[in-house]
Amino acid sequence: MAEEQREISHENNVSLGSAETAIPLTNVSISPTKKEEQKTVYLVLFGRTIYVESSSLESEETVMPIVDVPKSPAKEDLTTHCSLDAESSEKGFPVDPYMGILGNNPNINSNVTCAGNKDLTEDIIKFKKMRSLSKEKIVEEKGTRVLTELPPYTWTIKKTLKESDINHQCRLLLNTTDAENHIMRHLPTDDQKKIQEGIGVDVKAYDHDTYTEHDMVFKRHVKTSKSYVFNGGWAKAFVGRRELKEGDKIGLFWAKKSQTFMSQEQQGTSPLNTDEALKSHHSFSQNPNYIESNLSRRYQTNFSLGSQRISGQFLMIPNPGFVDTSSMTNTHDTSLANFQTVPTTTNPKIILKEEKENEEEQQYWTIKKELTKSDACQRLTLSKSSVEEHILKHLLPEDSQKIDKGKPGITVKVYDNDTDTEHELCLAFQCSYVLKNGWVKTFVKRRGLEEGDMIGLFWECSTSKLHFSVLFRVNAKAPAAEEKEAY
């Protein structure tokens, strides 16, 4: 039987840059007088010959679907003819085009790819399915896939807000160890030097609950407490906007580049838009020990903040996980009216964990005392055992002798951790150990202390200072005297 061979002209070649999932060949025609004859037609694609029976070309359109397969490193040189369409590149799919020829001839190789023969795998089927999804579904499907592959990251800095963190002082006080281990070490050397000299460094703070970015200043009080703080926007952008209160628990982590997974620079794709960030959101409110790294991929030199209510409820917008953003725009309303409050967990294990964290935080305060009436009116009386165990053993022998009964005592520097201020008191022994000569003025009146309030003290050996903090107040409302204090 006579056979006819011909090459498909250039205008009939298949373009792999098309965004369509199926490309018909409409210009292949067979002479009507030879329809009954059995003919063989071959296609030449990138130097590879594919034989096809003419019967498979009798229909008006020959459908040639394009699906995605993983790239073959060994045959990467053969993929230079292939180009992903712009839409696929934006989605960041790490795949190459796959072409399959439909036909009834069992000898036809239907697994011809630009990289050579490759059997269909479970991944190919999954990518093929994703090609047929809408843009919104692809983002959701991709987000789900990435979420399962990403390693967990922790909220490395957690803090239960104190009164001084939310009042007029307009700063968030950080634990020195946390700040140095989880923030300072990741900053450029120049910024570290500035901070150690007392110069503030501008940072971007991403609110993980409201998907908003804010400016703050990270600095250190080098002349007084040596403490690290965030200010320059903390009060307005977080305390006021989020209505943070004393007792709220917040989480922080620094999203450094080395922590990112599939970073945008590595993938060569554009930054995540707001909807994608919403799709992949994993809130501190839902799980204080986990973050989803899509956030890190976008904010690679910033730190992120999430908040959680301890007193019964926590604030969050929107609900965690994958959410429907069809009714949202890129400019999201983050007003407090749109905040959703949901009950906190009732899981006994989580409750016990939170209580344990609070206990660990209070272990810094080796001396704790509930103020008596005389403490609020005259001087602070401390138990003999607590002073001898946690203060005297850290003093020089000559200083310890000055505290003996009948001696005037010694002057000690007392750093108020809540207000970031330093004061001087006299530690003496009068039937019991006391702090006097300024206690009533600089602490009771300035801080508005009352009978029943719980305070904490601990001695810092490296600076030879006594640290002070109000751990609990009988009346939670901030006193007027403290509100008027200048920062």
UniProtKB/Swiss-Prot annotation:
In alphabetical order, the GO MF annotations are: DNA binding
Q: What is this protein called?
A: Putative B3 domain-containing protein At1g78640
Q: Where in the cell is it found?
A: Nucleus
Q: Which InterPro entries match?
A: B3_DNA-bd, B3_domain, DNA-bd_pseudobarrel_sf
Which keywords appear in this protein's UniProt record, sorted alphabetically?
Answer: DNA-binding, Nucleus, Repeat, Transcription, Transcription regulation
Q: Which residues bind DNA?
A: 171-269, 379-474
Task: Tell me which GO cellular component terms the UniProt record holds.
Answer: nucleus
